């Protein structure tokens, strides 16, 4: 029995970046031998075991064969005579198909085992497929795109990009389950440069299949006086990258990605103006979230951002009553933390423009002051002074909030 550390841990060690997780492959063992040594079986489709002390995953060396379309259409073969090279050959990219032996004490020993020249591709900053079996798993398209968001200076090898396009043309991407698509998109959004993920997905044609609403934004012009970058797709990528650079949450980054979907359906005869794009964005966003089964917290923030971002940009011109109505529409009084994320998304929108990434956004501080004033109103005390007439209570609380905001900002109602 020989144990090897494989995949991403070896890649990251060679790149000099922190190793998050280690995957292990066991060559020359049977499931019975593993359990006899205290390993606990957890694999459903193929033998994977948890180490009795570290709880890390150890998989028996295996090969795989495509038997049906989609992510789950594989048949696995594992046996003591499956070699390490055979196991590495089934992996997606050369940079993920390297290994090092693990000593009985758990330390890495010996040289890097690199049958597919992954080290050369690491030095060249290239994503290259291990074999033509790459085409058998459509998730690999999403994984390469996600890796591009993490390793932003890498490029996809021409021959690998050609295979990805073949897979898209063959409909393989259409067979992916929504949960897996969302999982990979979400992970890519949380990387340092999410725009690289979408660039790779566009290059191979996959973005038009999994997120056609986003794909439609490229080539749509905006007013150059507001958007020096002009192209809507370019703008949205700048917004997402700004949100990533600030370390904002997944919900904020998803809202940044989807806030301008309605610009993709603006009638050609009114371009480059986009009057009413906010409401069109909301209508496109709802089925998108349902289709990909987007988590509620991401969906809910994205809907508020899509609907209200234009209003937030204009708050310097608003009176107190308009500000309170904005707070009520966005549920800011009950959900101030979500409103803070709304501000982050809108600030990203304002700064995700060519040459304007350091532009002041005084709207954010104005809204923070106004919301604090509105929330300082004691609705309970007002209700006790009025009695049981709920409509009167509601109107009195509303008026008190307007007055509090007007006083805090020294503006008219």
UniProtKB/Swiss-Prot annotation:
GO terms for biological process: RNA repair; tRNA 3'-terminal CCA addition. Mg(2+) binds at residues 21, 23. The keyword Thylakoid does not apply. CDD domains: NT_ClassII-CCAase. It comes from the Bacteria. Magnesium is required for nucleotidyltransferase activity. Comprises two domains: an N-terminal domain containing the nucleotidyltransferase activity and a C-terminal HD domain associated with both phosphodiesterase and phosphatase activities. This is Multifunctional CCA protein. It comes from Burkholderia cenocepacia (strain ATCC BAA-245 / DSM 16553 / LMG 16656 / NCTC 13227 / J2315 / CF5610). The gene is cca.
């Amino acid at each position: 029995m020989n144990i090897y550390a494989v995949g991403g841990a070896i890649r990251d060690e060679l790149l000099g970046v922190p190793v998050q997780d280690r995957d292990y492959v066991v060559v020359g063992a049977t499931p019975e031998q593993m359990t006899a040594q205290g390993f606990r079986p957890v694999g459903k489709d193929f033998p994977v075991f948890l180490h009795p002390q570290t709880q890390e995953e150890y998989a028996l060396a295996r090969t795989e064969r495509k038997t049906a379309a989609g992510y789950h259409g594989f048949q696995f073969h594992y046996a003591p005579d499956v070699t390490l090279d055979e196991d590495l050959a089934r992996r997606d990219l050369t940079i993920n198909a390297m290994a090092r032996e693990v000593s009985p004490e758990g330390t890495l020993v010996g040289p890097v085992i690199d049958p597919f020249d992954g080290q050369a591709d690491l030095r060249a900053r290239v994503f290259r497929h291990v074999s033509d079996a790459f085409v058998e798993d459509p998730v690999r398209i999403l994984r390469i795109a996600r890796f591009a968001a993490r390793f932003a200076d890498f490029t996809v090898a021409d021959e690998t990009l050609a295979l990805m396009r073949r897979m898209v043309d063959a409909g393989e991407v259409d067979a992916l389950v929504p949960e897996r698509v969302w999982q990979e998109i979400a992970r890519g959004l949380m990387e340092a440069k999410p725009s690289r993920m979408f660039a790779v997905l566009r290059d191979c044609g996959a973005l038009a299949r999994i997120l056609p609403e986003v794909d439609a934004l490229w080539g749509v012009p905006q007013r150059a006086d507001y958007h020096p970058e002009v192209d809507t797709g370019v703008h949205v990528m700048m917004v997402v990258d700004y949100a990533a650079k600030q370390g904002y949450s997944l919900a904020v980054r998803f809202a940044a990605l989807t806030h301008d979907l309605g610009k993709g359906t603006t009638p050609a005869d009114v371009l480059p103006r986009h009057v009413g794009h906010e409401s069109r964005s909301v209508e496109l966003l709802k089925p998108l979230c349902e289709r990909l089964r987007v988590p509620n917290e991401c969906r809910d923030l994205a809907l508020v951002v899509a609907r209200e971002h234009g209003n937030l940009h204009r708050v310097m011109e608003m009176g107190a009553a308009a500000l309170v109505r904005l707070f009520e529409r966005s549920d800011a009084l009950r959900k101030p933390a979500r409103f803070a994320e709304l501000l982050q998304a809108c600030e990203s929108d304002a700064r995700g423009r060519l040459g304007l990434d350091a532009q002041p956004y005084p709207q954010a501080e104005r809204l923070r002051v106004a919301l604090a004033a509105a929330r300082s109103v004691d609705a309970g005390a007002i209700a006790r002074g009025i009695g049981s007439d709920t409509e009167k209570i509601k109107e009195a609380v509303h008026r008190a909030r307007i007055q509090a905001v007007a006083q805090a900002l020294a503006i008219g109602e």
